Amino acid sequence: MSRFIISSHSPNEEGNVVRVTPESAGWEYVGFEVYALTKGQTLRKETIDQEACLVLLKGKANIHTRHERWENIGLRMDVFEKIPPYSVYVPSNDVYEVQALTDLELAVCLAPGKGTYPARLIPPSEVGVEMRGAGNIERRIHNILPESKPADSLLVVEVFTPEGNWSSYPPHKHDQHNLPHESYLEETYYHQINPDHGFMVQRVYTDDRSIDETMVVKNGDVVLVPKGYHPVSAPPGYEGYYLNVMAGPVRTWKFRNDPDHEWVMESKLAAKQK
């Protein structure tokens, strides 16, 4: 298996099914966890020196922090309903407690925090929805925690790729601290597939090909993108979902397309406008 794939496993005692830490990934900023909680199960964590974005992938919950309480939040029961999710932002040096009111799949997105902003609910109405691309590179975007919304480090977005389409395309990268042209951001992809016995294909490669891996990705896999371009393809018959977490030294998303393939977007958009 590729060193960039972290596969999920059966839930442990606290419900964790996958965990990525900066130490395990060999980088500095991004952490990511998923919990599969049964109805009535409670998860309690301290954020310490990290901020967190709790994304209710499916199911309903009560979520409490040190100073806030949100009761009976959650709307979708499957990510492929394509309804924007409920999420909760939790600053560093705080505590969160999640009580599952139904079976619950919870993503915990982590990055260094400074405690600048208070805990807050991110309801579906505050999630920006857009269609990006055109033709067979069109995909649906839910901007959960974009750079226009307050946080110290985290950027969080989910993407739906129709069957037979590509996303994160044209291939782009953000691995150089070269503002305003490009920002350095580590990134994780948490994949789900409908139907769940299918697969996605993701390539991670650099200009010099010191990294060049094409991976078959299963439902529940996390793909690490430490650097390089990272396009995704959904085979016919299977639609893809992924949750992206990004963080780096500066909280801005500035990317560079692979110049060999940048023409594709221009061509697709021109065809769409005809």
UniProtKB/Swiss-Prot annotation:
Matching InterPro entries: Deoxy-glucuronate_isom_IolB, IolB_Bacilli, KduI/IolB_isomerase, RmlC-like_jellyroll, RmlC_Cupin_sf
A GO BP annotation: inositol catabolic process
Keyword terms of this UniProt record: Isomerase
Transmembrane segments: none
HAMAP family for the chain: IolB (MF_01673)
Protein's pathway: Polyol metabolism; myo-inositol degradation into acetyl-CoA; acetyl-CoA from myo-inositol: step 4/7
Family per record: Belongs to the isomerase IolB family.
PANTHER family membership: 5-DEOXY-GLUCURONATE ISOMERASE (PTHR39193:SF1)
Protein name: 5-deoxy-glucuronate isomerase
Isomerase recorded as keyword: yes
Top-rank EC class of the record's enzyme: isomerase
Natural source organism: Geobacillus thermodenitrificans (strain NG80-2)
Catalytic activity: 5-deoxy-D-glucuronate = 5-dehydro-2-deoxy-D-gluconate
Disulfide bonds: none
Enzyme Commission number(s) of this protein: 5.3.1.30
Record keyword Isomerase present: yes
GO molecular function terms attached to this record: 5-deoxy-D-glucuronate isomerase activity; glucuronate isomerase activity
Function text: Involved in the isomerization of 5-deoxy-glucuronate (5DG) to 5-dehydro-2-deoxy-D-gluconate (DKG or 2-deoxy-5-keto-D-gluconate).
